[in-house]
């Protein structure tokens, strides 16, 4: 079974406290509801021998590496979201990096490919198939997926109920956009059946 999935990687994107927890400045409203499904996707991936890659945002305390439109959230008096080393930058409860087998990518922009070593790491690992879970569908999920397609990954899958946006309407519209460029969009149940 593991042989079937050896060219596959699961990208778990931005499942961090500052994006998921109630009351966080950058909370994705639909994020909390997908946590159990993301946990299950990770469990299934590990059972099948699929490489798990954790994609997280981490910024410096002054926000010098954050997008211009977010810099107002960072100053010497104000701690912005997902500051490296803070609780807000940690993965939500229930998700843990397996230091021996998993890989972690730190990004400072929407796409997991932008100014990171993700593409070269996937190439040297022999990965040609990507499965995506996490938040937020119109931003980091979508940009990563569109970049993967632009980089000619032949098989990109977004687990629709293990990804989320601020509203169901935004989520659905973005899933449709990704489906229209050839991305597979199964539910967790459909994807788990494919794994059997």
From Swiss-Prot:
SUPFAM superfamilies attached to this UniProt entry: Isochorismatase-like hydrolases
One GO CC term on file: cytosol
InterPro entries linked to this entry: Isochorismatase-like_dom, Isochorismatase-like_sf
Coiled-coil regions, chain positions: none
Top-level taxon of origin: Eukaryota
A Pfam family: Isochorismatase
Function, as annotated: Does not possess nicotinamidase activity in vitro.
Family named by the database record: Belongs to the isochorismatase family.
PANTHER family: OS02G0276400 PROTEIN
Name of the protein: Probable inactive nicotinamidase At3g16190
């Amino acid at each position: 079974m593991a042989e079937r999935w050896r060219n596959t990687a699961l990208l778990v994107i931005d499942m961090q406290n500052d994006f998921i927890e109630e009351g966080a400045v950058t909370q994705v409203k639909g994020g909390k509801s997908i946590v159990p499904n993301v946990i299950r996707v990770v469990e299934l991936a590990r059972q099948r021998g699929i490489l798990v890659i954790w994609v997280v945002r981490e910024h410096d305390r002054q926000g010098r590496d954050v997008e211009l439109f977010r810099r107002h959230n960072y100053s010497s008096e104000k701690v912005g979201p997902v500051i490296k080393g803070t609780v807000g930058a940690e993965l939500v409860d229930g998700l843990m990096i397996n230091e021996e087998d998993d890989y972690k990518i730190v990004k400072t922009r929407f796409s997991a490919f932008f100014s990171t070593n993700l593409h070269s790491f996937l190439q040297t690992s022999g990965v040609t198939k990507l499965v995506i879970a996490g938040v937020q569908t119109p931003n980091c999920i979508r940009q990563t997926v569109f970049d993967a397609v632009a980089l000619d990954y032949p098989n990109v899958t977004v687990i629709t109920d293990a990804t989320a946006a601020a509203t169901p309407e935004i989520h659905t519209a973005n899933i449709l956009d990704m489906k229209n460029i050839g991305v597979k969009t199964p539910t967790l149940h459909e994807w788990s059946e494919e794994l059997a």
